[in-house]
A protein has these predicted regions:
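Catalytic-site neighborhood detector that most strongly recognizes the C-terminal catalytic loop/helix
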Residues: 148, 153-173
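Conserved tyrosine-mediated DNA breakage-rejoining catalytic core shared by Y-recombinases
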Residues: 12, 46-85
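Active-site/catalytic core of tyrosine-dependent DNA strand-transfer enzymes
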Residues: 80-118
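Basic, Lys/Arg- and aromatic-enriched nucleic-acid-binding interface segment
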Residues: 2, 10-41
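Short, charged phosphate-coordinating catalytic segments
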Residues: 4, 34-56
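Short alpha-helical segment immediately N-terminal to, or the first helix within
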Residues: 33-34, 133-137, 147, 170
């Protein structure tokens, strides 16, 4: 199997510092949504009012894959209590997120610097952070696979770059 670069997810402390460093509604919308949903940056940038199931508090994402390169694959992502008011507030006024993927990346980099995180932080690092946090909260790999929109479980496993401390802690809890 070819070498697969593994992005390092943020530690829980780094994720908390990043979330706490957000000062504006826009910053919280970006950081908290990425941390709580595992969306790809293109999916966040492309989010519109039509993607929200208001009654059931969830997002409907039409993502990568599908036949002939179309975005026909649909997945459903629940909105956490933390991001629901941000999404509701934003889309009560706006039809779209109103930011490009590059703008989201720049804003995230600025917040990471403000939070004194001394390594690269990108939307995809937050996607990995979401995946590790989901597993640590007890979400099954097949459920995580669906949340992330992966066709293959092996793709999802790439995201689970658990630290040695995580492995030891889980072993002690379960053994």
């Amino acid at each position: 199997m070819p070498y697969q670069y593994k992005r390092e997810p943020l530690t829980p402390d780094e994720a908390n510092r990043l979330a706490s460093a957000c000062e504006t509604h826009q910053e919280r919308l970006i950081v908290w949504t990425l941390l709580d949903t595992g969306l790809r940056v293109s999916e966040l940038a492309g989010l519109t009012r039509e993607h929200i199931d208001w009654q059931n508090h969830r997002l409907m994402i039409y993502g990568k894959g599908g036949i002939y390169g179309t975005k026909s694959k649909r997945r459903i992502i629940p909105l956490t209590d933390r991001i629901r008011p941000l999404i509701d507030g934003h889309f009560a006024i706006h039809d779209t997120i109103g930011m490009t993927p590059r703008t989201i990346q720049r804003i995230l980099k600025r917040i990471a610097n403000k939070a004194h995180i001394n390594r690269p932080v990108s939307p995809h690092v937050l996607r990995h952070t979401f995946a590790v946090a989901a597993v640590q909260k007890g979400i099954s790999l097949p459920a995580l696979q669906r949340l992330l929109g992966h066709d293959r479980l092996t793709t999802t496993e790439i995201y689970l770059n658990l630290s040695p401390e995580d492995v030891i802690r889980e072993f002690r809890e379960k053994w």
